[in-house]
Swiss-Prot record:
WD repeats lie at residues 22-62, 63-103, 105-141. Keywords: Cell cycle, Cell division, Mitosis, Nucleus, Repeat, Ubl conjugation pathway, WD repeat. One of its GO terms (biological process) is protein ubiquitination. The lineage of its organism: Eukaryota, Viridiplantae, Streptophyta, Embryophyta, Tracheophyta. InterPro entries: APC4, Apc4-like_WD40_dom, APC4_long_dom, WD40/YVTN_repeat-like_dom_sf, WD40_repeat_dom_sf, WD40_rpt. The APC/C is composed of at least 10 subunits. Component of the anaphase promoting complex/cyclosome (APC/C), a cell cycle-regulated E3 ubiquitin-protein ligase complex that controls progression through mitosis and the G1 phase of the cell cycle. The APC/C complex controls several key steps in the cell cycle by mediating ubiquitination and subsequent degradation of target proteins such as cyclins. The APC/C complex is required for the female gametophyte development and is involved in several aspect of development by controlling cell division and cell elongation. Involved in the control of endoreduplication. Belongs to the APC4 family. One of its GO terms (cellular component) is anaphase-promoting complex. It is found in: Nucleus. The gene is APC4. This is Anaphase-promoting complex subunit 4.
Length: 777
């Protein structure tokens, strides 16, 4: 019986294989949804796919540019995609619809990490603290960008389903505070609240890297640095950055008896102090909520102006094309008059010229007049509708929201520390009011112009009827005075176009002295401090307002950026120039685990960061085919200002005959390794295995006292390498040679492995529920 039992135990295969299916393309990036059994993948030709756990494909999209990174929003409802040109695209999980494009970088976005606040929404006093957005009390739902006329369904980027998703993306009132971290190829790291409002930026080349164990005031710089991975802790207090580069400008004289790490390319780990995000998360939440909604509404105004400009330009093009032939006929008949003079002559009762008669009766005709009338006056009504439904409501809500921010800025004790500047917000608030005045003026000008065009066309119809000796008693009447004004000032002028376009320097709108005097009188009664704003066009005023917003929002961005600093540098190992592994091919994984003895005090002892990576071959002669794991534990931020109280690491030797393809930190401090067998027959499909290592059982060695710029961190571990044995770990054989990436979901307990021969294998990493229940009992 005992022999049979032992045989059964040996036959138990860990990690149930869900399926092994062929795929038509090779995958370069794969990430599981944190909340659902959904897998997002990026193909080698940069198509983004979303599959269910059963491998049913939900959608495929192509951004049109090379995809370099991908991550999920913490709630699993959106995907952030980093592109080679520095763009970050946010897509809806339901249909892949593009929600937002951001451009915080100028070069390829190589890594993304989106983390939300792990704490409950309570303030320092323990009171429930969720910021209430009061806008919905006073305003209807925010307007959407108008559709460009003439587009069929599917052509516009403002589709209904996408608009609903975008509204949800911006509605952050009851969502947990979260931050998207993005790193690019040039060493820039950007921080965006809710993934849409940029709140900070640092460059690892410009950081002062502390070395307090040698000299309290010493620091150094990284040169030729490249970021590989970033990870933000769940309390938002710490950012871990894996990067490569050369340490220079160090003020410490190296010890001659040890290897100097300066001027050598190496793999480094930086621990950044981002505690400002936790300390001021409620204030930042409020600012980001208002500012991101203002930015959305600004885009509504921009789209409205663009649509209006195009519509009016098309209508005026139709008008001028129809009436251009009159000028040609006047010249052909040897006349020296202008079209306006010909029309005024006809209006005055003079004999009609042959040119004008030919134009009205033969070229234009009653049908032509009505067609132009419909185009111009119909467009005028459409423009009025765009203003009433989109532009004006957006400007009014912006005015309310910027006023809310101005009110917050007066609470200096809480908001001055994050850069909310009252003076800049006062200016932005006034500029919003100026835009609303410009909108009212535009509506008055548009109404007047449309009325005069309509009056002109009514007169033309009556004139054509008269010339053709047809009855015209039933036709609309016209106003002769308005007609004279139109022919003198509007026939070859376009005040609507002037207001919709940006004015050049020196092309300001002329304002009479009486109007300027009224504006100055209003100043004495608390009116606008600027008196010359009416000389600007509507488009110019919008640009002026947008510029003031950027200045006001730049202050929190700059302030927060300055408060992010480096508190620890770990020079892990050198990188030989001759190595076959580039930084982008070194398997790495970063994660944070909650401490068991934590008292839930953020920024002190809440989370331990784990860093796992494959040690590149040729790094050290004594270390080959090894996996490095380091963990940092910051016990008390008050006592240890610039570092951790504990830094530990361990080296794992990969079993003989295997090489590491990829790795991923898993839940409960576990590490999943994907290993390829080295002695595979070239004719076969190869063989690999997936191994789960319990990091909690490993003998970590403290390296906090040995950190020095004269020695690489891994050198202390050469004599204490832990050998991984296949029989001692959970191992699942894979009947294929495998390639990166290894996609592991800690929340769902699944892993996806990709084979060289284009196959996808999905495994369930969790044990049977029956076993778990029995264990609990």
């Amino acid at each position: 019986m005992s022999e049979m039992a032992s045989d059964e135990e040996e036959n138990i295969i860990p990690f149930q294989l869900q399926f092994d299916k062929p795929i038509p393309f090779q995958i370069k990036i794969a990430e599981w949804n944190p909340e659902k059994d959904l897998l997002a993948m990026v193909t080698e030709d940069s198509k983004i796919l979303l599959h269910r756990f059963n491998w049913q494909r939900l959608w495929t999209i192509s951004p049109g540019k090379p995809v370099t990174s991908l991550c999920w929003r913490p709630d699993g409802k959106a995907i952030a995609v980093g592109l080679e040109d520095g763009t970050i695209s946010l897509h809806d999980v339901e249909n892949g619809k593009l929600l937002r494009n951001l451009k915080p970088h100028d070069v390829a976005v190589v890594c993304l990490n989106w983390e939300e606040d792990g704490q409950s929404n309570t303030d320092e006093s323990g009171n429930f603290s969720v910021y209430e957005d009061r806008t919905s009390r006073f305003f209807p739902p925010a307007p959407r960008p108008p559709k460009m006329p003439g587009l069929v369904a599917g052509d516009s980027s403002f589709m209904d389903d996408g608009e609903d998703s975008l509204a949800e993306l911006s509605n952050t009132s009851f969502r947990k505070f979260n931050i998207l971290c993005t790193g690019d190829r040039d060493g820039n790291i950007c921080f965006s609240i809710f993934g849409i409002f940029q709140i900070g930026k640092i460059n690892i080349h410009e950081l002062s890297l502390p070395v307090p164990h040698l000299d309290e005031h010493a620091s150094c710089k990284l040169f030729n640095a490249s970021i590989y991975k970033v990870a933000l802790s769940k309390d938002l207090c710490r950012l871990v950055v894996m990067c490569t580069g050369e340490l220079k400008d160090c003020d410490i004289k190296p010890r001659e008896e040890k290897i100097n790490v300066q001027d050598l390319p190496g793999l480094h780990c930086l621990a950044m102090d981002t505690s400002i995000f936790w300390k001021r998360k409620y204030e930042l939440h409020q600012v980001a909520q208002q500012a991101s909604n203002i930015e959305d509404l600004t885009e509504v105004i921009r789209a409205s102006l663009s649509v209006m400009n195009k519509q009016w330009a098309d209508a005026m093009k139709t008008f001028h094309e129809k009436f251009h032939s009159l000028s040609t006929l006047i010249i052909d008949n040897g006349l020296e008059s202008s079209p306006q003079e010909e029309f005024l002559s006809l209006l005055g009762g003079a004999r009609i010229s042959p040119a004008l008669n030919q134009f009205l009766v033969n070229s234009l005709g009653e049908v032509g007049v009505k067609r132009v009338l419909k185009s111009v006056c119909g467009t005028g009504k459409e423009l009025q509708q765009v203003v009433l439904d989109h532009l004006q409501p957006a400007a009014e809500i912006i005015g309310f929201r910027i006023g809310e921010l101005r009110g917050l800025s007066r609470w200096r004790a809480r908001y001055q520390g994050i850069g909310l500047d009252e003076m800049l917000l006062n200016e932005a608030t006034e500029n919003t009011g100026l835009l609303l005045v410009q909108v009212q003026r535009f509506m008055m000008v548009l109404s007047s112009v449309v009325q005069q065009f309509s009056n002109f066309f009514n007169w033309l119809v009556r004139s054509i009827k008269y010339l053709m000796q047809e009855p015209n008693d039933q036709l609309l009447s016209y106003n002769s005075e308005l007609l004279v004004v139109f022919l003198k000032f509007l026939y070859d002028q376009d005040p609507v176009k002037d207001l919709l376009e940006l004015s050049e320097a020196g092309d300001d709108i002329e304002i009479d002295l009486k109007t300027i005097g009224r504006v100055k009188e209003l100043l004495q009664f608390g009116g606008f401090s600027e008196c010359d704003f009416l000389q600007r066009t509507l488009a110019k005023e919008f640009q002026h307002m947008e510029s003031s917003f950027k200045m006001a929002f730049q202050m929190p961005f700059t302030t927060i950026s300055r408060k992010i600093s480096c508190m620890k540098l770990l020079p892990l190992c050198p990188l030989q120039l001759s190595t076959t592994q580039t930084p982008t091919t070194i398997p790495m994984s970063l994660s944070f685990y909650k401490n068991e003895l934590s008292d839930d005090t953020p920024c002190q002892s809440g989370y331990t960061d784990y860093i796992s990576f494959q040690v590149p071959d040729e790094t050290f002669p004594e270390i080959s085919n090894c996996i490095g794991i380091a963990k940092g534990y910051k016990q008390n931020s008050n006592n240890e200002k610039n570092g951790y109280t504990s830094l530990e690491a361990v080296l794992l030797s990969v079993p003989n005959g295997y090489t590491c393809v990829d790795l991923s930190l898993y839940k409960d401090k576990e590490l999943v390794l994907l290993l390829n067998k080295t002695n595979t027959d070239s004719e076969g499909s190869g063989e690999a295995c997936m191994m789960v290592v319990q990091t909690g059982d490993l003998a970590f060695i403290s390296i906090s006292g040995s950190s020095s710029l004269n020695q690489w961190e891994l050198e202390d571990l050469k004599g204490s390498i832990v050998n991984l044995e296949m029989e001692n770990e959970k191992v699942r054989k894979v009947p294929h040679s495998v390639i990166a990436p290894l996609a592991v979901s800690a929340s769902r307990g699944v892993a996806c492995v990709f084979a060289e021969r284009r196959r996808a294998l999905v495994y369930i990493l969790e044990e049977d529920e029956d076993e778990e229940i029995s264990d609990e009992k």
